[in-house]
C-alpha cells in the first residue's frame, strides 16, 4: 500500500525551492553573520537564544547546537544583540562584508538578574558575587525561550523541572503542564487530555517521530490514543506541548500534539556521566520480607531501580547520548463498586457490592541511544533509537455480594441492605479470582540527514516505530480467572453513612461461605475457568523531506518552508476475548460435592481496605496457579466451552492499514515588533481494513445450519476469510498566527489552525457485537466521516525575570461531523429487519452529529522565581495553572475545570517541592436510566534532594502521598458508586554525577 506522493503533492516543495531564485536571497549589498552561543556555567550550547540586528527586522533564534545564522544583513558596521531570559542582554558591533560572512560567538555568564539592575553596555559582562547553577531556573529559562521562539501556541517543560518522576512514567510528569489532565487506569497515568478533550484528539511523538501504540491490544474507541506506560522519561530532555498547529505539523490533533525531545550530545561540551540507584516502596507493604501477592506466591514489595546516562561530544564531530534505566514498584489497587438500580418505584436500590483487592507489580526498562555525526561543516547525520519494556503483573480479585432488586428487602436503605434468599442463583456470593501479565515492548528508530548552507536548509528523515502489547496467563503459569458462586443463601450489609465504604457483611442463611466445598453446589456455574491471552501490534513507517530558505521580499526577511511526508500505520489484533472451561472435577460433575477448587495457599488474603470486615471473615479463595497445574495434569476434569472458544479463536483477529500522504508550504516573516506565520497543508488519507463480511443469521438458518454450532459459524463468516474494505479522503488545512511584542517582556499572540479527527479503528475494521443481557447489537460504521475542526487561540504572555511567566489564554474549537458512539438505528438499516432472533433488540451504531459543535475555554498559567525576597527566601519559587473547558452539549469525560501547581525551594545543597493536581467532577457515562460521574480529585506529590558535595545527591520522591482515592457516583453526589484506593508510592535514591 505504500506509494510515492502524487506529483500534485510535491508542487509546494518545488515552489518553495524555486521561488527564492526569482527573489533576492542574498543581495550584493548584504552579508551574513554566523556564530554559536555557549553557557560556560552549564557547559551547554544555548538553544533558542534571540539574536537580532538592531535597527532592522532581522531576528533569528539559535539552533539545537547553539548555532545561528543571520542572512541579508546590510553590509558594513552593524550592532548585534543576544537576549536570553535570566541573563543580561549582550551586544557587539562588527563589520559585515558584502557577499561574505562575519563570525561572532557569545558566552552567557551567570544568571545576572537583580531587581533594579541596569543592563550591561556593549560587550561588558555583569558578574555576580557568587553564581550557583540552578537546574530548575535553567530548565525554566529553556522552556520560556522555546515558547518565545514558537509562532504557534506552545508550552515547554524541562524533564527535570519537577524532580524525579516515580516509576519513570511520562504521564506523571505531564500532568503538571498547563491545560493537561491525565486519565488514570487504576494507579497508572495512562493517557492525556489536553484542554479537557478525549485522548484520541492528541498525538505523541519523539523528536517528531510518531510513536506506535498498541492501545492495550484492543480495537475499541481508544485504539487511536497513546498510552504512556510504553514510554520512559529517562532519555527525554524536554516535553513540548503544542496547542495549535502549523502547516509543518500533522493535522490529526485537534487538541494538540506532544513532542518528547530527546537529549543531544551536541548541545554540550565535554563528557557527562550520571548513575542513580533507588528503592521504591508502598506504605501498605513497607517491609523487606517477602509477602503474598500478586499471584499465588510471595514477593518483595520494596523494589529496586537504577538509571545510567552517558553523554560525550568528540571534538564536536561525533556525539553519543546513552541512557539506560530500569525500575520496579508495588502498587495496591483496592476498592468497592456499588451497583445502583435507579429504575424502581422506591428510588435507588443498591443490589450489588463488588469488593476489589488487585495488588500489582510494575516493571519498566528503557534504553536510548542517540548518535550524531558532523559529516561536513554543513551536513549532520543523526540516529535516535529508543527501546522500552513494560511488565505489569496484577491480581484482579473480586468478591461480589449480589441480588436482584426484587430480592432486596423493602426495609433496606442506603446504609443497610438485606438480600433475601431465593430458590435459585439470584441471591449469591461470587468469587472471581483473576491473575494476568501485561507486556509491552516498543522500539523507535529515527534517522535524519540535515544540510545547512547559507540561506538553505534541507532535512531528509524517516523512522520506524513498533509497539507490541500482549496479555499472558497460561504461559506464565496460571489462569486469568477462577469463578466460584455460593447460592441459595442470604446476606446483610451495614455501613456508617451513605457515602462511606465501611460495609459490615453478615451471612444470614445458607451454606457457610467460609468453606470452599460449599461453592458451585446446587446451581450450575458454567464456564467458571477462563483465560485471556490476546495480543496486538502497531507499526508506523515514516518518511519526509523538508526544505527551508531565508530570503528578502519587499524589504522584509521571509522564511519559506515546504515539505512532503508519508506515514503508514498498521495495527494488527491477533486475538481478544475470554476462552473458558467448566471445572467438573474427577467426578465429571460440577455439582458433585467432591468437585472443589484448590484453595489459595494463604487464607484470609483478601483485603479491599475500605474499612469493611472482609479481611476478618477469613474467606477462602481459589488458587489460579494450582488450578492451571491441575488442568495440565488432568485435562479431563475441565469441559471446554467449545463453541465460544472457537468463535474467539477464529473471529476476533482484525487488521487495519492507514496511509497519510501530506505536503505543505509555510511562510514566516517579521515586521517591526510583529512576527507572522501563514501556511497550508494537504493530507490524503487511504485506509484498508481487513475484516469479515458476515452473513445475516436468517440467511444462514435458511441454508440449513443450526445456530450456535461451528458449521453455522463457518458459513456465516464465509469460512473465516477476511476481506479488504477500502476508504479514503483528502483535506486542506490552513494555519497561521501572529506574535506582537507590546513590550520587551509582554507579548500578544493570536493563532489558528484547521485539523482532522479520523474515525476509530473499530469502525474501519470492526465486527458486530451482541449483548444478550442488555438486548443490544453494536454495529460498526465503516462510512463514519472524519471530524474536521477549526481552532482559534488568543494569549497574552508576560515574562517575569529571571525565569517566570504569566499568561492568560482563551480558545475556541468548532467541530464538524462530531462522532458519537452507539446511536440507535432501525434494524433494517443494518441488515437485521427479517431476523426474529433479535426481535426487541436495540441496534446501536456510531454516527456523526449534524452541524457544528463548539468547545470554548480559558487557561491561566503562572510561574515565578521569588528572587526579590530577602535571604534564604530567594530560593523559593511557585508555579500553577487553571483551565476551564465549556462544550455546547453534554459530553462524557470532558474535564470542565482543572488546576495544578506547586511551591519549590532550592539552594546550593538542598531542594524540595510540593505539587498538586485537581480536576473537577466529570460525567463518565450518560445512559437512559443513569448518569455516572467521577468526583473531583485532589492529589499531592513531593520530591527533593540533598547534595553530598559536588558529586552525589540523595533524592526522594512521593506520588499521591495522601492516598487520594478515585471516587464516582450515580446521578447525585450522595449516591456513591465506586471508591478505589491505590496508596502512596515513595522512592529513595542516590545519584552521582561524574
Which residues does each PLM region occupy?
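Gram-negative outer-membrane beta-barrel transporters
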Residues: 807-815, 819-826, 830-922
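Solvent-exposed loop segments that connect transmembrane elements
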Residues: 334-355, 395-433, 478-529, 582-599, ...
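Short, acidic Ser/Thr/Gly-rich low-complexity loop/linker segments typical of extracellular
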Residues: 56-67, 71
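Short loop/turn motifs that connect adjacent beta-strands in outer-membrane beta-barrel proteins
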Residues: 124-126, 265-271, 314-318, 378, ...
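Outer-membrane beta-barrel signature, preferentially recognizing the C-terminal barrel domain
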Residues: 427-444, 648, 652-661, 726-727, ...
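Conserved C-terminal beta-signal and adjacent last beta-strands/turns
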Residues: 529-532, 536, 544-552, 557-561, ...
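Periplasmic N-terminal accessory/gating domains of Gram-negative outer-membrane beta-barrel systems
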Residues: 88, 100, 107-109, 114-202, ...
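Transmembrane beta-barrel wall of Gram-negative outer-membrane proteins
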Residues: 296-405, 430, 437-454, 734-737
Amino acid at each position: 500500500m505504500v506509494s510515492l506522493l502524487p506529483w500534485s503533492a510535491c508542487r509546494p516543495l518545488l515552489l518553495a525551492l524555486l521561488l527564492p531564485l526569482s527573489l533576492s536571497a542574498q543581495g550584493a549589498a548584504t552579508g551574513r553573520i554566523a556564530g554559536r552561543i555557549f553557557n560556560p556555567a552549564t557547559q551547554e550550547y544555548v538553544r533558542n537564544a534571540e539574536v537580532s540586528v538592531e535597527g532592522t527586522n532581522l531576528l533569528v533564534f539559535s539552533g539545537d547546537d547553539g548555532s545561528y545564522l543571520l542572512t541579508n544583513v546590510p553590509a558594513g558596521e552593524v550592532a548585534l544583540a543576544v537576549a536570553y531570559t535570566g541573563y543580561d542582554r549582550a551586544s557587539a558591533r562588527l563589520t559585515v562584508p558584502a557577499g561574505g560572512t562575519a563570525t561572532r560567538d557569545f558566552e552567557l555568564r551567570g544568571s545576572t538578574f537583580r531587581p533594579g539592575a541596569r543592563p550591561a553596555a556593549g560587550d561588558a559582562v555583569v558578574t555576580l558575587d557568587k553564581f550557583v547553577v540552578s537546574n530548575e531556573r535553567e530548565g525554566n529559562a529553556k522552556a520560556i525561550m522555546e515558547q518565545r521562539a514558537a509562532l504557534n501556541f506552545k508550552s515547554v517543560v524541562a524533564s527535570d523541572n519537577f524532580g524525579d518522576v516515580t516509576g519513570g512514567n511520562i504521564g506523571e510528569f505531564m500532568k503538571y503542564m498547563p491545560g493537561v489532565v491525565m486519565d488514570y487506569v487504576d494507579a497508572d497515568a495512562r493517557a492525556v487530555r489536553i484542554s479537557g478533550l478525549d485522548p484520541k484528539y492528541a498525538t505523541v511523538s519523539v523528536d517528531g517521530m510518531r510513536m506506535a501504540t498498541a492501545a492495550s491490544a484492543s480495537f475499541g474507541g481508544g485504539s487511536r490514543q497513546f498510552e504512556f506506560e510504553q514510554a520512559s522519561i529517562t532519555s527525554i530532555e524536554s516535553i513540548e506541548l503544542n496547542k495549535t498547529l502549523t502547516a509543518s505539523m500533522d493535522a490529526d490533533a485537534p487538541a494538540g500534539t506532544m513532542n518528547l525531545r530527546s537529549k543531544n550530545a551536541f548541545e554540550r561540551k565535554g563528557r557527562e556521566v550520571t548513575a542513580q540507584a533507588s528503592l521504591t516502596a508502598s506504605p501498605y507493604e513497607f517491609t523487606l520480607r517477602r509477602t503474598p501477592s500478586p499471584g499465588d506466591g510471595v514477593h518483595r514489595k520494596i523494589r529496586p531501580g537504577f538509571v545510567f546516562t552517558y553523554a560525550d561530544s568528540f571534538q564536536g564531530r561525533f556525539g553519543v547520548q546513552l541512557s539506560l534505566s530500569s525500575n520496579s514498584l508495588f502498587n495496591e489497587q483496592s476498592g468497592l463498586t456499588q451497583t445502583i438500580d435507579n429504575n424502581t418505584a422506591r428510588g435507588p436500590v443498591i443490589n450489588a457490592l463488588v469488593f476489589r483487592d488487585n495488588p500489582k507489580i510494575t516493571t519498566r526498562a528503557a534504553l536510548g541511544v542517540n548518535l550524531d555525526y558532523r559529516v561536513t561543516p554543513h551536513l549532520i547525520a543523526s540516529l535516535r533509537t529508543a527501546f522500552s519494556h513494560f511488565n505489569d503483573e496484577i491480581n484482579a480479585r473480586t468478591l461480589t455480594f449480589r441480588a436482584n432488586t426484587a430480592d432486596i428487602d423493602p426495609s433496606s436503605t442506603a446504609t443497610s441492605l438485606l438480600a433475601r434468599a431465593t430458590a435459585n442463583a439470584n441471591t449469591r456470593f461470587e468469587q472471581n479470582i483473576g491473575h494476568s501479565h501485561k507486556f509491552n515492548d516498543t522500539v523507535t528508530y529515527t534517522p535524519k540527514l540535515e544540510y545547512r548552507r547559507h540561506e538553505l536548509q534541507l532535512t531528509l528523515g524517516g523512522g520506524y516505530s513498533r509497539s507490541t502489547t500482549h496479555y499472558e496467563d497460561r504461559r506464565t503459569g496460571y489462569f486469568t480467572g477462577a469463578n466460584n458462586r455460593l447460592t441459595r443463601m442470604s446476606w446483610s450489609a451495614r455501613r456508617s453513612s451513605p457515602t462511606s465504604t465501611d460495609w459490615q457483611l453478615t451471612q444470614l442463611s445458607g451454606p457457610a461461605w467460609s468453606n470452599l466445598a460449599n461453592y458451585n453446589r446446587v446451581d450450575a456455574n458454567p464456564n467458571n475457568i477462563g483465560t485471556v491471552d490476546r495480543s496486538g501490534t502497531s507499526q508506523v513507517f515514516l518518511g519526509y523531506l523538508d526544505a527551508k530558505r531565508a530570503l528578502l521580499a519587499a524589504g522584509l526577511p521571509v522564511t519559506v518552508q515546504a515539505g512532503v511526508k508519508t506515514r503508514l500505520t498498521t495495527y494488527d489484533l491477533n486475538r481478544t476475548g475470554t476462552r473458558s472451561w467448566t471445572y467438573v472435577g474427577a467426578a465429571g460433575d460440577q455439582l458433585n460435592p467432591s468437585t472443589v477448587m484448590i484453595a489459595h495457599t494463604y487464607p484470609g488474603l483478601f483485603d479491599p481496605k475500605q474499612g469493611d470486615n472482609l479481611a476478618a471473615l477469613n474467606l477462602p479463595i481459589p488458587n489460579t496457579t494450582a488450578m492451571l497445574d491441575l488442568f495440565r495434569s488432568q485435562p479431563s476434569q475441565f469441559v471446554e466451552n467449545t463453541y465460544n472458544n472457537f468463535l474467539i479463536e477464529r473471529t476476533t483477529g482484525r487488521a487495519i492499514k492507514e496511509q497519510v500522504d501530506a505536503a505543505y508550504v509555510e511562510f514566516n516573516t517579521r515586521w517591526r515588533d510583529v512576527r507572522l506565520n501563514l501556511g497550508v497543508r494537504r493530507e490524503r488519507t487511504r485506509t484498508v481494513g481487513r475484516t469479515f463480511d458476515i452473513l445475516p443469521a436468517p440467511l444462514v438458518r435458511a441454508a440449513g445450519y443450526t445456530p450456535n454450532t461451528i458449521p453455522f459459524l463457518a458459513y456465516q463468516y464465509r469460512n473465516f476469510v477476511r476481506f479488504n474494505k477500502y476508504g479514503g479522503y483528502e483535506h486542506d488545512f490552513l494555519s497561521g498566527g501572529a506574535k506582537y511584542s507590546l513590550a520587551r517582556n509582554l507579548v500578544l499572540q493570536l493563532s489558528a489552525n484547521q485539523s482532522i479527527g479520523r474515525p476509530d479503528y473499530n469502525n474501519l475494521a470492526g465486527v458486530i457485537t451482541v449483548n444478550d443481557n442488555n438486548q443490544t447489537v453494536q454495529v460498526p460504521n465503516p462510512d463514519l466521516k472524519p471530524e474536521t475542526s477549526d481552532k482559534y487561540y488568543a494569549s497574552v504572555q508576560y515574562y517575569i525575570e529571571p525565569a517566570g511567566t504569566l499568561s492568560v489564554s482563551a480558545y475556541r474549537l468548532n467541530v464538524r461531523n462530531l462522532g458519537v458512539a452507539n446511536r440507535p438505528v432501525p434494524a433494517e438499516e443494518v441488515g437485521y429487519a427479517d431476523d426474529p432472533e433479535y426481535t426487541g433488540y436495540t441496534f446501536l451504531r456510531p454516527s456523526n452529529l449534524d452541524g457544528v459543535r463548539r468547545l470554548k475555554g480559558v487557561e491561566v498559567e503562572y510561574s515565578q522565581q521569588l528572587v526579590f525576597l530577602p535571604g534564604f527566601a530567594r530560593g523559593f519559587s511557585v508555579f500553577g495553572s487553571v483551565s476551564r473547558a465549556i462544550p455546547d452539549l453534554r459530553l462524557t469525560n470532558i474535564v470542565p475545570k482543572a488546576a495544578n501547581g506547586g511551591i519549590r525551594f532550592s539552594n546550593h545543597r538542598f531542594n524540595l517541592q510540593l505539587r498538586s493536581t485537581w480536576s473537577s467532577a466529570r460525567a463518565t457515562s450518560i445512559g437512559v436510566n443513569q448518569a455516572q460521574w467521577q468526583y473531583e480529585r485532589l492529589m499531592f506529590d513531593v520530591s527533593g534532594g540533598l547534595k553530598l558535595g559536588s558529586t552525589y545527591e540523595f533524592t526522594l520522591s512521593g506520588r499521591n502521598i495522601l492516598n487520594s482515592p478515585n471516587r464516582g457516583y450515580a446521578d447525585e453526589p450522595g449516591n456513591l458508586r465506586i471508591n478505589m484506593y491505590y496508596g502512596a508510592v515513595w522512592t529513595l535514591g542516590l545519584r552521582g554525577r561524574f
